[in-house]
């Protein structure tokens, strides 16, 4: 089956929905959203807790409520979508191959594509935990789906490895469902989640958080019977004699998220090794002109509100590209200096910036009373004071056209600088 669409969006989660709605509002009528699940909304459908929408809608919503707001806009604008449909591949000249049980094999010619595939969880195999291989070991997201959508309880006595936001939220969810969460162990000396989740999900329920600890052994024949954690040194190696044993039946893993970029790599899109997502410019455009990306497929976000904001930019940019309104120009590279893990975008052209450029980034460690500084040729063109920064919380800085006008090189450097005493 051969089809033609102006814009194809791969992924019908919060990023794909926001991008589709924005593209339609910017004059693109022929849009197709492709989603491999049986419903739109992506991961939000299993996030039944509240805390979503504070930035986007100025009110607190649950995940399904937030998704429904965007789905309603999609339906209202009559944007076409296909569910239960798998994208098999994308070519550089923007031909999408997809398959489902109704239409069969489809070849879709597009003028532009937006990648919004989200991310997946890192598994036990990826982090090589030693020990037996019994039942009762789940990723936090899988446990979340079992409990919130399928109605199955995953265990009664639980240990959680990793303090990412999903792990913290599942510590609370399991407690509310009647399980006993014995401990949360985190390999790093700081939590990987938002401070508000540590307070609301662990502190409020007296669940201990062990920083600089990891699982060193899993014991169990058919089902998990015991999990042993131990303190680690600065090289992340377990310190003998610091072991703590927990008799439990379940181990949850919240050990990081990986942007879902198998299709991106196969298409030949350049990937940033720091984010594991596509390298993008000021328009959220990848290294292949006309193919854009946004949301967790580019870099992992803390808040879905920020995913929506970023995806609207991608939707608007794709509309501009289709209408031939994108201006080419010299790229200015954004380099990371002291303390900065990555930035998005990684490069930009002055010609396409209307009012300002927003840079998203994460720091490498916890900082207090510092400045984020932007330099051009070792000259500070912008600085922002920060009382507290942590790797678990994404930072954003906005560079105005006036600031950008001070750049006199083909690169800028973003770094953390200690406050002058």
Language-model regions, residue ranges each:
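FAD-binding core/adjacent interface of flavoenzyme oxidoreductases
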Residues: 1-10, 68-157, 233-241, 252, ...
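FAD-site-proximal beta/loop scaffold in flavoenzymes
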Residues: 115, 137-147, 250-301
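Predominantly flavin-linked oxidoreductase catalytic cores and closely associated redox partners
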Residues: 105-106, 115-209, 214-223, 290, ...
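Exposed aromatic-hydrophobic patches
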Residues: 360, 392-403
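Short, aromatic- and glycine-rich surface loops/edge beta-strands on solvent-exposed regions
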Residues: 372-374, 402-421
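A Rossmann-like FAD-binding core segment of flavoenzymes
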Residues: 69-91, 96-98, 175-262, 355-386
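Mid-to-C-terminal Rossmann-like scaffold of FAD/NAD(P)H-dependent oxidoreductases
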Residues: 305-306, 313, 317-384
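Beta1-alpha1 glycine-rich phosphate/pyrophosphate-binding loop at the start
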Residues: 5-69, 73, 145, 154-200
């Amino acid at each position: 089956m051969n089809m033609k669409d102006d814009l194809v969006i791969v992924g019908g989660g919060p990023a794909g929905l926001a991008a589709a709605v924005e593209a339609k509002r910017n004059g693109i009528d022929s849009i197709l959203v492709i989603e491999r699940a049986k419903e739109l909304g992506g991961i939000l459908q299993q996030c039944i807790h509240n805390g979503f929408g504070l930035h986007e809608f100025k009110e607190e919503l649950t995940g399904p409520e937030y998704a429904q707001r965007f789905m309603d806009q999609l339906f209202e604008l009559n944007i076409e979508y296909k569910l239960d449909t798998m994208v098999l591949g994308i070519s550089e000249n923007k031909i999408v191959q997809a398959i489902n049980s109704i239409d069969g094999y489809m070849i879709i010619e597009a003028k532009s594509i937006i990648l919004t595939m989200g991310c997946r969880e890192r598994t036990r195999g990826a982090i090589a935990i030693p020990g037996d291989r019994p039942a009762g070991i789940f990723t936090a997201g899988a446990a979340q789906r079992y409990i919130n959508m399928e109605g199955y309880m995953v265990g009664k006595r639980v240990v959680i490895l990793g303090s990412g936001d999903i792990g913290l939220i599942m510590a609370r969810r399991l407690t509310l469902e009647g399980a006993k969460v014995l401990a949360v162990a985190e390999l790093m000396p700081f939590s990987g989640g938002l401070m508000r989740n540590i307070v609301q999900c662990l502190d409020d329920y007296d669940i201990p958080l062990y920083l600089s600890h990891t699982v060193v052994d899993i014991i169990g024949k058919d089902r998990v019977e015991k999990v042993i954690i131990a303190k680690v040194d600065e090289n992340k190696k377990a310190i003998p004699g610091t072991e703590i044993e927990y008799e439990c039946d379940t181990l949850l893993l919240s050990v990081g998220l990986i942007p879902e970029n198998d299709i991106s790599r196969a298409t030949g899109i350049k990937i940033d090794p720091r984010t594991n997502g596509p390298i993008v410019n000021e328009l959220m455009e990848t290294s292949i002109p006309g193919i854009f990306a946004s949301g967790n497929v580019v870099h992992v976000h803390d808040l879905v509100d920020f995913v929506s904001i970023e995806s609207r930019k991608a939707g608007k940019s794709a509309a501009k590209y289709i209408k031939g309104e994108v201006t080419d120009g010299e790229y200015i590279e954004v380099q990371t200096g002291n303390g900065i893990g990555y930035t998005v975008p990684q490069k930009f052209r002055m010609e396409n910036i209307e009012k300002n450029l927003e840079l998203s980034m994460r720091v490498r460690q916890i900082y207090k009373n510092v400045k984020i500084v932007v330099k051009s040729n070792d000259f500070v063109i912008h600085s922002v004071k920060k009382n507290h920064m942590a790797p678990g919380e994404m930072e954003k800085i906005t560079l105005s056209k006036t600031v950008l006008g001070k750049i006199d090189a083909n690169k800028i450097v973003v770094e953390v600088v200690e406050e002058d005493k």
